Design a protein with these regions (language model features):
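Long amphipathic alpha-helical coiled-coil segments
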Residues: 153, 157-158, 360-370
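C-terminal structured "cap/appendage" subdomains that terminate the fold
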Residues: 316-354
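Amphipathic alpha-helical coiled-coil scaffold segments and their short linker/junction regions
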Residues: 1-3, 35, 49, 55, ...
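Periplasmic alpha-helical coiled-coil/stalk elements that build and connect Gram-negative outer-membrane
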Residues: 49, 58, 65-183, 294, ...
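Sec/SRP-type N-terminal targeting helices
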Residues: 2-3, 29, 43-71, 97, ...
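Small/polar, glycine/serine/threonine/aspartate-rich low-complexity segments that form flexible
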Residues: 12-38, 161-180, 209, 222-262, ...
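A short glycine-centered flexible hinge/capping loop motif at secondary-structure junctions
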Residues: 113-117, 323-327, 364-368
Length: 383
């Protein structure tokens, strides 16, 4: 597109064999040889070509920003599914630990029943509680496998191919105490969707200038320089030199309003792009504010869940000790064990939700991802 600002130069060479008609006076057949250069230049007086270059450059930047948007979305989806995987693993670990604890409780109740210190209903209630916990484990295992498979597919691998790589105990990644959103201008500069919308607006604005320039006269200059001769050997001689210069000024005098309508249509397209950009900015700011509020609430919720889980563990241990000492009934043991399982499971869910909302916040801010992150993840997976 930039080449439109400069003259175009072409070179040519050829030979022509001709014979005149007999009824206008027959002349001997002759061959004419020629070689030379032609140059043409449309001077960009009113900026139409420059506006076209600006529009093309802005379109290219918008496409690049759209690609960045896809990359950010992919990285966010990978991170979210990884958190889902860790959540299922944590909840599975909690369920299995509680299953082991309830099995111990069942054994204690069975011994007390054999010693005549507990009723048979206590044994059956302990067994019921244990089996209810066992029944919830398969669903968590299915969720874990689904998260592993989804993560593999997102990284371009076949389902199940990451199972060995992701094996082992993996804690939740740490989270920052606070996230600085920065000023709105920072968000506008970072978010790929807003960059794409702004570049689209710039392209449509440039096209308005391009349409306007078409309504004004165009100035064209031309030049040719070469040689002509009746023999190839004579080309290049002083007598064979030929040259010319030309110039033209052209303007549309009447087109039925076509060019004027083109300007009006493009102006409407530019207005649509402006409205889309403004709407995108407001939606982005709203998304950031909502994500900040959600993350702040998540941190408070996690702190409360941690305290509740700690208290539930202490209560479960105390009630078991009291029961073994004959100072508490078995219903209290069952109640505190169920409360502990629920509190620990809710804590794991809250921990995962907080990190998922942090991912949403980073995505809303248009930052938080290092350049090339998707490519690096793919390389690690392939190796």
């Amino acid at each position: 597109a930039v080449g439109g600002l400069f003259p175009s130069v072409t070179g040519s060479t050829g030979a022509t064999r001709s014979r005149s008609a007999a009824n206008i006076g027959a002349l001997p057949a002759r061959t004419t040889y020629d070689a030379g250069f032609d140059a043409a230049w449309e001077i960009d007086i009113f900026g139409g070509t420059r506006r076209g270059i600006e529009a093309a450059t802005a379109d290219q930047a918008a496409v690049a920003a759209d690609l960045d948007k896809v990359r950010v979305s992919l990285v966010a989806e990978v991170a979210r599914n990884y958190i889902d995987l860790l959540s299922y693993r944590r909840r599975l670990s909690i369920a299995r630990d509680n299953l082991a604890s309830q099995s111990e409780t069942l054994q204690i109740v069975a011994w007390r029943y054999q010693a005549g210190l507990a009723a048979s209903t206590d044994v059956e209630q302990a067994r019921t509680s244990r089996e209810q916990t066992r029944a919830g484990i398969p669903d968590l295992e299915v969720g874990q496998v689904a998260a592993e498979n989804r993560l593999a597919v997102l990284l371009g691998s076949s389902p199940g191919s990451l199972r060995v790589m992701l094996a082992g105990d993996r804690p939740f990644p740490p989270v920052p105490a606070s996230v600085g959103a920065g000023i709105p201008a920072d968000i506008l500069a970072r978010r790929p969707d807003l960059v794409a919308a702004e570049r689209t607006l710039a392209a449509e604005t440039a096209r308005v200038g391009q349409r306007l320039a078409q309504r004004f006269p165009s100035l064209n200059l031309g030049a040719s320089f070469g040689w002509q001769a009746y023999s190839f050997a004579a080309l290049g001689g002083s007598g064979s030199l030929a040259r010319s210069l030309s110039g033209s000024l052209a303007a549309t005098l009447f087109d039925g309003g076509r060019l004027k309508s083109a300007v009006a249509i493009q102006s409407a397209v530019q207005e649509q792009a402006l409205i889309a950009y403004r709407s995108g900015v407001l939606a982005a700011l709203e998304e950031v504010e909502n994500a900040l509020a959600a993350y702040a609430a998540d941190r408070e919720r996690v702190e409360a869940r941690q305290a509740a889980a700690e208290a539930a563990r202490n209560a479960a241990q105390l009630s078991r000790n009291l029961y073994q000492s004959g100072l508490a009934d078995f219903q209290k043991v069952l109640e505190t064990e169920r409360t502990r399982l629920s509190a620990e499971d809710n804590l794991a869910i809250a921990e995962a939700t907080m990190r998922s909302d942090l991912i949403k916040l980073y995505k809303a801010l248009g930052g938080g991802w290092e350049a090339g992150a998707v490519q690096e993840i793919s390389k690690d997976t392939a190796s």
